[in-house]
Protein backbone atom coordinates (compact mmCIF):
# COMPACT_ATOMS: atom_id res chain seq x y z
CA UNK A 1 0.00 0.00 0.00
CA UNK A 2 1.36 3.42 -0.91
CA UNK A 3 2.17 5.91 1.80
CA UNK A 4 -0.19 8.41 0.16
CA UNK A 5 -2.94 5.80 0.20
CA UNK A 6 -2.41 5.17 3.91
CA UNK A 7 -2.71 8.87 4.63
CA UNK A 8 -5.75 9.09 2.39
CA UNK A 9 -7.55 6.30 4.21
CA UNK A 10 -6.71 7.84 7.57
CA UNK A 11 -7.92 11.22 6.38
CA UNK A 12 -11.14 9.71 5.04
CA UNK A 13 -11.67 7.89 8.34
CA UNK A 14 -11.16 11.05 10.37
CA UNK A 15 -13.45 13.00 8.06
CA UNK A 16 -16.15 10.36 8.36
CA UNK A 17 -15.78 10.44 12.15
CA UNK A 18 -16.35 14.18 12.22
CA UNK A 19 -19.18 13.95 9.68
CA UNK A 20 -20.95 11.29 11.72
CA UNK A 21 -20.36 13.28 14.89
CA UNK A 22 -21.70 16.44 13.26
CA UNK A 23 -24.86 14.69 12.13
CA UNK A 24 -25.31 12.96 15.50
CA UNK A 25 -24.66 15.99 17.68
CA UNK A 26 -25.97 18.84 15.49
CA UNK A 27 -28.07 18.07 12.40
CA UNK A 28 -30.24 15.41 14.06
CA UNK A 29 -30.81 17.39 17.26
CA UNK A 30 -31.96 20.43 15.29
CA UNK A 31 -34.71 18.34 13.70
CA UNK A 32 -35.62 16.98 17.14
CA UNK A 33 -35.72 20.50 18.57
CA UNK A 34 -38.14 21.60 15.84
CA UNK A 35 -40.31 18.58 16.58
CA UNK A 36 -40.37 19.41 20.28
CA UNK A 37 -41.31 23.01 19.56
CA UNK A 38 -44.26 21.78 17.51
CA UNK A 39 -45.36 19.54 20.39
CA UNK A 40 -45.30 22.49 22.79
CA UNK A 41 -47.29 24.66 20.37
CA UNK A 42 -49.92 21.95 20.10
CA UNK A 43 -50.08 21.60 23.88
CA UNK A 44 -50.51 25.34 24.38
CA UNK A 45 -53.20 25.51 21.71
CA UNK A 46 -55.33 22.99 23.57
CA UNK A 47 -57.45 23.73 26.59
CA UNK A 48 -55.66 22.75 29.76
CA UNK A 49 -57.67 19.84 31.03
CA UNK A 50 -55.05 18.03 33.03
CA UNK A 51 -55.64 18.15 36.76
CA UNK A 52 -52.95 19.86 38.78
CA UNK A 53 -52.29 16.63 40.62
CA UNK A 54 -49.21 16.25 42.74
CA UNK A 55 -47.62 13.50 44.74
CA UNK A 56 -50.46 13.82 47.22
CA UNK A 57 -52.68 12.07 44.70
CA UNK A 58 -50.86 8.83 44.08
CA UNK A 59 -47.83 8.24 46.26
CA UNK A 60 -47.81 4.58 47.21
CA UNK A 61 -48.89 4.78 50.82
CA UNK A 62 -49.95 1.51 52.49
CA UNK A 63 -53.71 1.12 52.38
CA UNK A 64 -54.14 3.89 49.83
CA UNK A 65 -53.61 4.16 46.09
CA UNK A 66 -55.13 7.56 45.43
CA UNK A 67 -55.81 10.78 47.25
CA UNK A 68 -58.08 13.60 46.02
CA UNK A 69 -56.42 15.76 43.40
CA UNK A 70 -57.15 19.26 42.25
CA UNK A 71 -59.78 20.46 39.83
CA UNK A 72 -58.73 21.64 36.37
CA UNK A 73 -57.63 25.24 36.16
CA UNK A 74 -57.93 27.88 33.48
CA UNK A 75 -54.61 28.85 31.93
CA UNK A 76 -53.39 32.22 33.16
CA UNK A 77 -50.49 34.46 32.32
CA UNK A 78 -47.60 34.26 34.76
CA UNK A 79 -48.32 37.67 36.37
CA UNK A 80 -52.01 36.75 36.75
CA UNK A 81 -51.15 33.42 38.38
CA UNK A 82 -48.72 35.08 40.79
CA UNK A 83 -51.31 37.67 41.78
CA UNK A 84 -54.00 35.04 42.40
CA UNK A 85 -52.51 33.83 45.72
CA UNK A 86 -50.93 35.45 48.80
CA UNK A 87 -47.16 35.10 48.76
CA UNK A 88 -43.95 35.50 50.73
CA UNK A 89 -41.33 37.41 48.77
CA UNK A 90 -38.03 35.64 47.99
CA UNK A 91 -34.91 37.80 47.83
CA UNK A 92 -31.33 36.45 47.90
CA UNK A 93 -28.07 37.46 46.20
CA UNK A 94 -28.78 34.97 43.40
CA UNK A 95 -32.55 34.40 43.40
CA UNK A 96 -35.77 36.37 43.41
CA UNK A 97 -39.40 35.32 43.34
CA UNK A 98 -41.94 34.20 45.93
CA UNK A 99 -43.36 31.33 47.99
CA UNK A 100 -47.03 30.52 47.42
CA UNK A 101 -48.94 30.50 50.72
CA UNK A 102 -51.70 28.54 49.04
CA UNK A 103 -50.20 25.08 49.15
CA UNK A 104 -46.88 26.27 50.63
CA UNK A 105 -45.23 25.66 47.27
CA UNK A 106 -41.98 27.01 45.94
CA UNK A 107 -43.26 27.92 42.49
CA UNK A 108 -41.77 31.30 41.59
CA UNK A 109 -37.99 31.38 41.21
CA UNK A 110 -35.90 33.49 38.82
CA UNK A 111 -32.13 33.84 38.59
CA UNK A 112 -30.56 37.26 39.17
CA UNK A 113 -27.19 36.61 37.55
CA UNK A 114 -28.40 34.89 34.37
CA UNK A 115 -30.32 36.28 31.43
CA UNK A 116 -31.80 34.66 28.35
CA UNK A 117 -29.37 36.30 25.92
CA UNK A 118 -26.23 38.44 26.02
CA UNK A 119 -28.29 41.62 25.51
CA UNK A 120 -28.19 43.91 28.54
CA UNK A 121 -31.98 44.28 28.60
CA UNK A 122 -32.61 40.56 28.19
CA UNK A 123 -35.07 39.06 30.73
CA UNK A 124 -33.77 37.06 33.67
CA UNK A 125 -33.98 33.29 33.48
CA UNK A 126 -37.28 32.11 34.96
CA UNK A 127 -36.86 28.66 36.48
CA UNK A 128 -40.05 27.81 38.41
CA UNK A 129 -43.60 28.90 37.59
CA UNK A 130 -46.93 28.40 39.41
CA UNK A 131 -49.80 26.13 38.51
CA UNK A 132 -52.22 27.62 36.02
CA UNK A 133 -49.52 29.16 33.83
CA UNK A 134 -48.62 27.79 30.38
CA UNK A 135 -45.72 25.75 31.82
CA UNK A 136 -46.14 25.01 35.55
CA UNK A 137 -42.92 23.91 37.24
CA UNK A 138 -42.74 23.82 41.04
CA UNK A 139 -41.52 22.05 44.17
CA UNK A 140 -43.64 20.78 47.02
CA UNK A 141 -43.31 18.79 50.24
CA UNK A 142 -45.49 17.52 53.04
CA UNK A 143 -47.12 14.40 54.41
CA UNK A 144 -49.54 11.76 53.17
CA UNK A 145 -51.42 9.09 55.11
CA UNK A 146 -53.56 6.01 54.44
CA UNK A 147 -57.11 6.88 53.41
CA UNK A 148 -58.59 4.85 56.27
CA UNK A 149 -56.85 7.14 58.76
CA UNK A 150 -59.30 9.88 57.83
CA UNK A 151 -56.76 12.65 58.48
CA UNK A 152 -57.19 16.16 57.15
CA UNK A 153 -53.78 16.97 55.69
CA UNK A 154 -52.57 20.10 53.87
CA UNK A 155 -53.39 20.11 50.16
CA UNK A 156 -52.44 22.25 47.19
CA UNK A 157 -55.27 24.69 47.96
CA UNK A 158 -54.58 24.89 51.72
CA UNK A 159 -53.89 28.44 52.87
CA UNK A 160 -50.94 28.71 55.26
CA UNK A 161 -50.01 31.64 57.47
CA UNK A 162 -46.47 33.10 57.53
CA UNK A 163 -44.49 34.76 60.29
CA UNK A 164 -42.78 37.21 57.93
CA UNK A 165 -43.25 38.74 54.48
CA UNK A 166 -39.79 38.26 52.97
CA UNK A 167 -37.54 35.18 52.82
CA UNK A 168 -33.82 35.98 52.80
CA UNK A 169 -30.66 34.02 53.69
CA UNK A 170 -30.62 35.83 57.02
CA UNK A 171 -34.34 35.44 57.80
CA UNK A 172 -36.07 32.05 57.37
CA UNK A 173 -39.86 31.94 57.08
CA UNK A 174 -42.09 29.65 59.14
CA UNK A 175 -45.47 28.69 57.69
CA UNK A 176 -48.25 27.28 59.87
CA UNK A 177 -51.47 25.39 59.20
CA UNK A 178 -53.93 24.11 61.84
CA UNK A 179 -56.28 21.46 60.47
CA UNK A 180 -58.78 22.04 63.27
CA UNK A 181 -58.66 18.36 64.24
CA UNK A 182 -55.69 18.39 66.57
CA UNK A 183 -52.85 18.47 64.06
CA UNK A 184 -50.75 21.61 63.62
CA UNK A 185 -48.27 21.73 60.75
CA UNK A 186 -45.21 23.98 60.74
CA UNK A 187 -42.87 24.41 57.79
CA UNK A 188 -39.69 26.44 58.14
CA UNK A 189 -38.17 27.43 54.80
CA UNK A 190 -34.61 28.72 54.76
CA UNK A 191 -32.41 29.56 51.79
CA UNK A 192 -28.68 30.13 51.41
CA UNK A 193 -27.00 32.82 49.33
CA UNK A 194 -26.80 30.54 46.28
CA UNK A 195 -29.50 28.08 45.17
CA UNK A 196 -30.37 25.73 48.05
CA UNK A 197 -33.62 25.77 50.02
CA UNK A 198 -34.05 23.76 53.23
CA UNK A 199 -37.57 22.68 54.19
CA UNK A 200 -38.03 21.60 57.80
CA UNK A 201 -41.49 20.19 58.52
CA UNK A 202 -42.83 19.67 62.04
CA UNK A 203 -46.21 18.23 63.09
CA UNK A 204 -47.76 18.68 66.53
CA UNK A 205 -50.17 15.91 67.51
CA UNK A 206 -52.66 17.33 70.02
CA UNK A 207 -55.08 14.44 69.64
CA UNK A 208 -55.41 11.50 72.03
CA UNK A 209 -54.26 8.95 69.43
CA UNK A 210 -50.98 8.24 67.68
CA UNK A 211 -50.78 9.49 64.09
CA UNK A 212 -48.79 7.83 61.29
CA UNK A 213 -47.64 10.00 58.40
CA UNK A 214 -45.35 9.51 55.42
CA UNK A 215 -43.14 12.48 54.46
CA UNK A 216 -42.70 13.29 50.79
CA UNK A 217 -41.06 15.89 48.59
CA UNK A 218 -41.41 16.41 44.87
CA UNK A 219 -40.70 18.46 41.79
CA UNK A 220 -43.50 18.59 39.22
CA UNK A 221 -43.38 19.83 35.65
CA UNK A 222 -46.43 20.20 33.42
CA UNK A 223 -46.20 19.97 29.64
CA UNK A 224 -43.40 18.75 27.42
CA UNK A 225 -40.39 21.08 27.88
CA UNK A 226 -38.44 22.15 24.81
CA UNK A 227 -34.95 20.72 25.24
CA UNK A 228 -31.75 21.57 23.38
CA UNK A 229 -32.09 18.17 21.73
CA UNK A 230 -28.40 17.25 21.56
CA UNK A 231 -27.39 13.62 22.02
CA UNK A 232 -24.23 14.72 23.81
CA UNK A 233 -26.34 16.28 26.57
CA UNK A 234 -28.95 14.77 28.88
CA UNK A 235 -32.05 16.84 29.62
CA UNK A 236 -35.01 15.46 31.53
CA UNK A 237 -35.36 13.49 34.74
CA UNK A 238 -32.19 12.75 36.65
CA UNK A 239 -31.18 11.44 40.03
CA UNK A 240 -28.94 9.38 42.27
CA UNK A 241 -30.89 7.17 44.68
CA UNK A 242 -28.82 5.16 47.12
CA UNK A 243 -26.47 2.76 45.38
CA UNK A 244 -28.53 2.54 42.19
CA UNK A 245 -26.14 4.81 40.32
CA UNK A 246 -26.90 7.84 38.19
CA UNK A 247 -30.34 7.67 36.59
CA UNK A 248 -30.89 9.73 33.43
CA UNK A 249 -34.40 9.39 32.04
CA UNK A 250 -35.50 11.41 29.03
CA UNK A 251 -39.08 12.53 28.50
CA UNK A 252 -39.39 10.07 25.63
CA UNK A 253 -38.01 7.22 27.71
CA UNK A 254 -40.39 7.68 30.66
CA UNK A 255 -43.28 7.81 28.20
CA UNK A 256 -42.33 4.34 26.96
CA UNK A 257 -41.96 2.82 30.44
CA UNK A 258 -44.57 0.40 31.74
CA UNK A 259 -47.11 2.49 33.67
CA UNK A 260 -44.89 5.48 32.78
CA UNK A 261 -43.12 5.09 36.13
CA UNK A 262 -39.65 4.09 37.33
CA UNK A 263 -38.89 3.75 41.03
CA UNK A 264 -35.80 3.02 43.12
CA UNK A 265 -35.11 2.60 46.82
CA UNK A 266 -32.03 3.64 48.74
CA UNK A 267 -30.45 5.89 51.34
CA UNK A 268 -28.92 9.17 50.31
CA UNK A 269 -29.19 10.90 46.98
CA UNK A 270 -31.35 13.31 45.04
CA UNK A 271 -33.70 13.50 42.05
CA UNK A 272 -35.42 16.06 39.89
CA UNK A 273 -35.23 17.74 36.49
CA UNK A 274 -32.22 19.02 34.60
CA UNK A 275 -32.00 21.34 31.63
CA UNK A 276 -28.82 22.29 29.82
CA UNK A 277 -27.76 24.88 32.41
CA UNK A 278 -30.48 24.83 35.09
CA UNK A 279 -31.97 22.26 37.45
CA UNK A 280 -34.62 21.78 40.11
CA UNK A 281 -33.97 18.74 42.29
CA UNK A 282 -34.97 17.52 45.73
CA UNK A 283 -32.60 15.92 48.23
CA UNK A 284 -34.24 14.07 51.16
CA UNK A 285 -32.43 13.59 54.46
CA UNK A 286 -29.23 11.79 53.40
CA UNK A 287 -29.33 9.44 56.40
CA UNK A 288 -32.93 8.29 55.90
CA UNK A 289 -34.01 5.63 53.39
CA UNK A 290 -36.57 6.69 50.80
CA UNK A 291 -38.26 5.58 47.61
CA UNK A 292 -37.54 7.80 44.63
CA UNK A 293 -39.85 7.78 41.67
CA UNK A 294 -39.89 9.19 38.15
CA UNK A 295 -43.29 9.32 36.48
CA UNK A 296 -45.44 10.75 33.72
CA UNK A 297 -49.21 11.18 33.81
CA UNK A 298 -51.81 12.82 31.63
CA UNK A 299 -52.72 12.50 27.98
CA UNK A 300 -53.47 15.90 26.49
CA UNK A 301 -50.85 17.69 28.57
CA UNK A 302 -48.33 15.36 30.22
CA UNK A 303 -47.34 15.91 33.83
CA UNK A 304 -43.81 14.84 34.67
CA UNK A 305 -42.92 14.31 38.30
CA UNK A 306 -40.02 13.22 40.46
CA UNK A 307 -40.84 12.48 44.08
CA UNK A 308 -39.34 10.96 47.21
CA UNK A 309 -41.39 9.10 49.81
CA UNK A 310 -39.88 8.56 53.25
CA UNK A 311 -40.58 5.86 55.86
CA UNK A 312 -43.55 5.98 58.22
CA UNK A 313 -43.40 8.60 60.95
CA UNK A 314 -45.53 7.81 64.01
CA UNK A 315 -46.29 10.73 66.33
CA UNK A 316 -47.53 9.91 69.83
CA UNK A 317 -50.42 11.84 71.42
CA UNK A 318 -49.07 15.17 72.61
CA UNK A 319 -45.84 14.57 70.72
CA UNK A 320 -44.09 16.19 67.79
CA UNK A 321 -42.53 14.68 64.68
CA UNK A 322 -40.98 16.01 61.55
CA UNK A 323 -38.89 15.68 58.44
CA UNK A 324 -36.27 17.65 56.53
CA UNK A 325 -35.60 17.91 52.81
CA UNK A 326 -33.74 20.23 50.50
CA UNK A 327 -34.49 21.81 47.15
CA UNK A 328 -31.85 22.93 44.69
CA UNK A 329 -33.29 25.42 42.21
CA UNK A 330 -30.75 27.28 40.15
CA UNK A 331 -27.75 27.25 37.85
CA UNK A 332 -25.55 24.17 37.60
CA UNK A 333 -22.35 25.93 38.60
CA UNK A 334 -19.55 23.41 39.00
CA UNK A 335 -18.06 24.78 42.21
CA UNK A 336 -21.49 25.29 43.77
CA UNK A 337 -22.47 21.67 43.16
CA UNK A 338 -19.13 20.46 44.51
CA UNK A 339 -19.63 22.54 47.65
CA UNK A 340 -23.11 21.10 48.24
CA UNK A 341 -21.76 17.60 47.78
CA UNK A 342 -18.94 18.20 50.27
CA UNK A 343 -20.58 20.51 52.81
CA UNK A 344 -24.11 19.06 52.88
CA UNK A 345 -23.10 15.48 52.13
CA UNK A 346 -25.46 15.18 49.15
CA UNK A 347 -24.42 11.99 47.42
CA UNK A 348 -22.75 12.46 44.01
CA UNK A 349 -24.36 15.85 43.59
CA UNK A 350 -21.66 16.89 41.11
CA UNK A 351 -23.17 14.44 38.59
CA UNK A 352 -26.01 16.88 38.09
CA UNK A 353 -23.73 18.22 35.35
CA UNK A 354 -23.64 15.77 32.46
CA UNK A 355 -19.88 15.22 32.20
CA UNK A 356 -20.48 12.19 30.00
CA UNK A 357 -18.87 8.76 29.86
CA UNK A 358 -15.39 10.31 29.69
CA UNK A 359 -15.77 12.03 33.05
CA UNK A 360 -12.14 11.23 33.83
CA UNK A 361 -11.04 13.41 30.88
CA UNK A 362 -13.76 16.05 30.76
CA UNK A 363 -13.70 17.00 34.43
CA UNK A 364 -9.90 17.53 34.59
CA UNK A 365 -10.13 19.47 31.33
CA UNK A 366 -12.64 21.83 32.93
CA UNK A 367 -10.53 22.18 36.08
CA UNK A 368 -7.46 23.13 34.06
CA UNK A 369 -9.43 25.53 31.88
CA UNK A 370 -11.09 27.18 34.87
CA UNK A 371 -7.79 27.46 36.75
CA UNK A 372 -6.20 29.23 33.78
CA UNK A 373 -9.26 31.47 33.48
CA UNK A 374 -8.86 32.59 37.09
CA UNK A 375 -5.38 33.80 36.15
CA UNK A 376 -6.02 35.38 32.72
CA UNK A 377 -9.62 36.51 33.25
CA UNK A 378 -10.94 35.40 29.84
CA UNK A 379 -12.13 31.93 28.87
CA UNK A 380 -11.12 32.49 25.24
CA UNK A 381 -7.56 33.26 26.28
CA UNK A 382 -7.73 30.25 28.63
CA UNK A 383 -8.60 28.07 25.63
CA UNK A 384 -5.53 29.37 23.81
CA UNK A 385 -3.39 28.63 26.87
CA UNK A 386 -4.74 25.11 27.35
CA UNK A 387 -4.01 24.39 23.69
CA UNK A 388 -0.37 25.35 24.25
CA UNK A 389 -0.36 23.17 27.38
CA UNK A 390 -1.72 20.18 25.47
CA UNK A 391 0.88 20.72 22.77
CA UNK A 392 3.60 20.75 25.43
CA UNK A 393 2.32 17.55 27.08
CA UNK A 394 2.22 15.65 23.79
CA UNK A 395 5.34 17.27 22.36
CA UNK A 396 7.55 14.13 22.57
CA UNK A 397 5.09 12.06 20.56
CA UNK A 398 4.36 14.87 18.13
CA UNK A 399 8.09 15.51 17.78
CA UNK A 400 8.68 11.90 16.71
CA UNK A 401 5.77 12.13 14.29
CA UNK A 402 6.99 15.31 12.66
CA UNK A 403 10.55 13.97 12.51
CA UNK A 404 9.21 10.93 10.72
CA UNK A 405 7.41 13.22 8.28
CA UNK A 406 10.61 15.21 7.77
CA UNK A 407 12.50 12.01 6.97
CA UNK A 408 9.75 11.06 4.54
CA UNK A 409 10.36 14.31 2.69
CA UNK A 410 14.10 13.70 2.70
CA UNK A 411 13.69 10.37 0.93
CA UNK A 412 11.10 11.59 -1.59
CA UNK A 413 13.59 11.26 -4.49
CA UNK A 414 14.31 7.64 -3.53
CA UNK A 415 10.59 6.88 -3.22
CA UNK A 416 9.91 8.42 -6.62
CA UNK A 417 12.72 6.38 -8.17
CA UNK A 418 11.32 3.14 -6.72
CA UNK A 419 7.84 3.90 -8.01
CA UNK A 420 9.17 4.58 -11.47
CA UNK A 421 11.39 1.48 -11.42
CA UNK A 422 8.57 -0.84 -10.35
CA UNK A 423 5.68 0.98 -12.01
CA UNK A 424 4.37 -2.27 -13.51
CA UNK A 425 4.82 -4.38 -10.36
CA UNK A 426 2.84 -2.87 -7.50
CA UNK A 427 3.64 -5.71 -5.09
CA UNK A 428 7.38 -5.36 -5.63
CA UNK A 429 7.06 -1.58 -5.44
CA UNK A 430 5.35 -1.82 -2.06
CA UNK A 431 7.93 -4.29 -0.75
CA UNK A 432 10.80 -2.01 -1.75
CA UNK A 433 9.10 1.02 -0.21
CA UNK A 434 8.61 -0.82 3.07
CA UNK A 435 12.26 -1.87 3.03
CA UNK A 436 13.22 1.76 2.48
CA UNK A 437 11.05 2.85 5.44
CA UNK A 438 12.60 0.14 7.61
CA UNK A 439 16.14 1.05 6.58
CA UNK A 440 15.56 4.75 7.29
CA UNK A 441 13.61 3.96 10.53
CA UNK A 442 10.47 5.73 9.33
CA UNK A 443 6.89 5.09 10.45
CA UNK A 444 4.82 5.79 7.31
CA UNK A 445 1.64 6.59 9.25
CA UNK A 446 3.27 8.69 11.96
CA UNK A 447 2.26 11.91 10.23
CA UNK A 448 -1.38 11.37 11.19
CA UNK A 449 -0.66 10.76 14.88
CA UNK A 450 -0.83 14.45 15.90
CA UNK A 451 -4.36 14.66 14.49
CA UNK A 452 -5.36 11.40 16.20
CA UNK A 453 -3.95 12.66 19.50
CA UNK A 454 -6.02 15.81 19.50
CA UNK A 455 -9.36 14.07 18.86
CA UNK A 456 -9.98 13.08 22.54
CA UNK A 457 -8.94 16.57 23.61
CA UNK A 458 -11.23 18.05 20.97
CA UNK A 459 -14.28 16.16 22.20
CA UNK A 460 -13.43 16.74 25.88
CA UNK A 461 -13.18 20.47 25.25
CA UNK A 462 -16.39 20.35 23.22
CA UNK A 463 -18.16 18.72 26.16
CA UNK A 464 -16.81 21.33 28.57
CA UNK A 465 -17.88 24.19 26.32
CA UNK A 466 -21.29 22.66 25.77
CA UNK A 467 -22.42 21.57 29.23
CA UNK A 468 -20.77 23.90 31.74
CA UNK A 469 -22.57 27.10 32.59
CA UNK A 470 -19.25 28.83 33.17
CA UNK A 471 -18.84 28.87 29.37
CA UNK A 472 -22.33 30.25 28.78
CA UNK A 473 -22.17 33.81 27.45
CA UNK A 474 -18.42 33.93 28.20
CA UNK A 475 -16.94 36.52 25.81
CA UNK A 476 -13.69 36.42 23.89
CA UNK A 477 -12.80 39.52 21.90
CA UNK A 478 -14.65 41.53 19.28
CA UNK A 479 -17.86 39.97 18.03
CA UNK A 480 -17.52 36.74 20.04
CA UNK A 481 -19.71 37.38 23.09
CA UNK A 482 -20.56 33.75 23.84
CA UNK A 483 -17.92 31.04 23.48
CA UNK A 484 -20.55 28.32 23.91
CA UNK A 485 -22.49 29.51 20.83
CA UNK A 486 -21.53 29.44 17.13
CA UNK A 487 -19.85 32.46 15.56
CA UNK A 488 -22.73 34.96 15.09
CA UNK A 489 -21.33 36.38 11.83
CA UNK A 490 -22.15 34.85 8.46
CA UNK A 491 -20.46 35.17 5.09
CA UNK A 492 -23.68 34.45 3.21
CA UNK A 493 -25.37 37.65 4.40
CA UNK A 494 -22.14 39.62 4.06
CA UNK A 495 -21.58 39.53 7.82
CA UNK A 496 -24.88 41.22 8.61
CA UNK A 497 -25.12 43.71 5.75
CA UNK A 498 -28.00 41.78 4.19
CA UNK A 499 -31.18 41.61 6.36
CA UNK A 500 -31.67 37.84 6.59
CA UNK A 501 -30.29 34.86 8.47
CA UNK A 502 -29.09 32.10 6.11
CA UNK A 503 -29.15 29.52 8.90
CA UNK A 504 -32.97 29.72 8.94
CA UNK A 505 -33.28 28.48 5.37
CA UNK A 506 -35.01 25.07 5.28
CA UNK A 507 -32.94 21.97 4.57
CA UNK A 508 -29.64 23.78 3.93
CA UNK A 509 -29.55 26.29 6.79
CA UNK A 510 -27.28 24.10 8.93
CA UNK A 511 -24.64 24.17 6.20
CA UNK A 512 -24.65 27.95 5.88
CA UNK A 513 -23.43 28.89 9.38
CA UNK A 514 -20.06 30.07 8.13
CA UNK A 515 -18.74 32.96 10.19
CA UNK A 516 -15.39 34.68 10.43
CA UNK A 517 -13.77 32.21 12.83
CA UNK A 518 -14.77 29.12 10.80
CA UNK A 519 -13.22 30.82 7.77
CA UNK A 520 -10.02 31.52 9.70
CA UNK A 521 -10.03 27.89 10.84
CA UNK A 522 -10.36 26.73 7.23
CA UNK A 523 -7.42 28.90 6.18
CA UNK A 524 -5.28 27.56 9.05
CA UNK A 525 -6.12 24.00 8.05
CA UNK A 526 -5.27 24.82 4.43
CA UNK A 527 -1.86 26.12 5.53
CA UNK A 528 -1.29 23.03 7.67
CA UNK A 529 -1.97 20.71 4.75
CA UNK A 530 0.30 22.74 2.50
CA UNK A 531 3.20 21.92 4.81
CA UNK A 532 3.41 18.65 2.87
CA UNK A 533 3.80 18.10 -0.87
CA UNK A 534 0.66 17.28 -2.82
CA UNK A 535 -0.03 13.57 -3.42
CA UNK A 536 0.76 12.30 -6.88
CA UNK A 537 -2.58 10.53 -7.21
CA UNK A 538 -5.27 12.92 -8.61
CA UNK A 539 -8.05 11.46 -6.43
CA UNK A 540 -5.99 11.85 -3.27
CA UNK A 541 -5.00 15.33 -4.34
CA UNK A 542 -8.64 16.38 -4.72
CA UNK A 543 -9.54 14.79 -1.40
CA UNK A 544 -6.88 16.70 0.50
CA UNK A 545 -7.72 19.92 -1.35
CA UNK A 546 -11.36 19.77 -0.27
CA UNK A 547 -10.78 18.77 3.35
CA UNK A 548 -10.36 22.37 4.64
CA UNK A 549 -13.59 23.36 2.89
CA UNK A 550 -15.48 20.39 4.33
CA UNK A 551 -14.22 21.08 7.85
CA UNK A 552 -15.10 24.78 7.51
CA UNK A 553 -18.74 23.94 6.80
CA UNK A 554 -18.90 21.26 9.49
CA UNK A 555 -17.37 23.37 12.25
CA UNK A 556 -19.49 26.39 11.38
CA UNK A 557 -22.22 25.26 13.76
CA UNK A 558 -19.84 24.27 16.56
CA UNK A 559 -19.32 26.51 19.62
CA UNK A 560 -17.03 29.38 18.68
CA UNK A 561 -14.69 28.46 21.54
CA UNK A 562 -14.09 25.09 19.91
CA UNK A 563 -13.44 26.66 16.51
CA UNK A 564 -10.96 29.04 18.12
CA UNK A 565 -9.25 26.06 19.75
CA UNK A 566 -9.02 24.19 16.43
CA UNK A 567 -7.68 27.28 14.64
CA UNK A 568 -5.03 27.93 17.27
CA UNK A 569 -4.09 24.25 17.32
CA UNK A 570 -3.60 24.27 13.53
CA UNK A 571 -1.44 27.39 13.81
CA UNK A 572 0.73 25.86 16.53
CA UNK A 573 1.03 22.66 14.51
CA UNK A 574 2.35 24.60 11.51
CA UNK A 575 4.90 26.41 13.68
CA UNK A 576 5.92 23.22 15.48
CA UNK A 577 6.32 21.25 12.27
CA UNK A 578 8.34 24.08 10.68
CA UNK A 579 10.78 24.19 13.60
CA UNK A 580 11.22 20.41 13.68
CA UNK A 581 11.78 20.23 9.92
CA UNK A 582 14.41 22.98 10.08
CA UNK A 583 16.18 21.15 12.89
CA UNK A 584 16.16 17.99 10.76
CA UNK A 585 17.68 19.86 7.82
CA UNK A 586 14.56 19.48 5.67
CA UNK A 587 13.23 22.38 3.64
CA UNK A 588 9.92 23.84 4.81
CA UNK A 589 7.81 23.77 1.67
CA UNK A 590 4.81 25.74 2.89
CA UNK A 591 5.56 28.85 0.87
CA UNK A 592 6.60 26.89 -2.24
CA UNK A 593 3.46 24.75 -2.07
CA UNK A 594 1.25 27.81 -1.66
CA UNK A 595 2.87 29.57 -4.60
CA UNK A 596 2.57 26.42 -6.69
CA UNK A 597 -1.14 26.14 -5.87
CA UNK A 598 -1.89 29.76 -6.74
CA UNK A 599 0.16 29.60 -9.95
CA UNK A 600 -1.89 26.59 -11.05
CA UNK A 601 -5.10 28.46 -10.22
CA UNK A 602 -3.92 31.44 -12.27
CA UNK A 603 -3.07 29.25 -15.27
CA UNK A 604 -6.43 27.48 -15.22
Swiss-Prot record:
Region ranges (Disordered): 42-84
Membrane disposition: Multi-pass membrane protein
One Gene Ontology cellular component annotation held by this UniProt entry: plasma membrane
Localization, UniProt: Cell inner membrane
Disulfide bonds listed in the record: none
Family annotation (CDD domains): 5TM_YidC_Alb3 (cd20070), EcYidC-like_peri (cd19961)
UniProt cross-references to InterPro entries, sorted A to Z: Membr_insert_YidC, Membr_insert_YidC_N, YidC/ALB3/OXA1/COX18, YidC/Oxa/ALB_C, YidC_ALB_C, YidC_periplasmic_sf
Transmembrane keyword on record: yes
Keyword Transport belongs to the record: yes
Keywords: Cell inner membrane, Cell membrane, Chaperone, Membrane, Protein transport, Transmembrane, Transmembrane helix, Transport
UniProt record similarity statement: Belongs to the OXA1/ALB3/YidC family. Type 1 subfamily.
Purpose: Required for the insertion and/or proper folding and/or complex formation of integral membrane proteins into the membrane. Involved in integration of membrane proteins that insert both dependently and independently of the Sec translocase complex, as well as at least some lipoproteins. Aids folding of multispanning membrane proteins.
SUBUNIT field: Interacts with the Sec translocase complex via SecD. Specifically interacts with transmembrane segments of nascent integral membrane proteins during membrane integration.
Protein name: Membrane protein insertase YidC
Organism classification: Bacteria, Pseudomonadati, Pseudomonadota, Alphaproteobacteria, Hyphomicrobiales
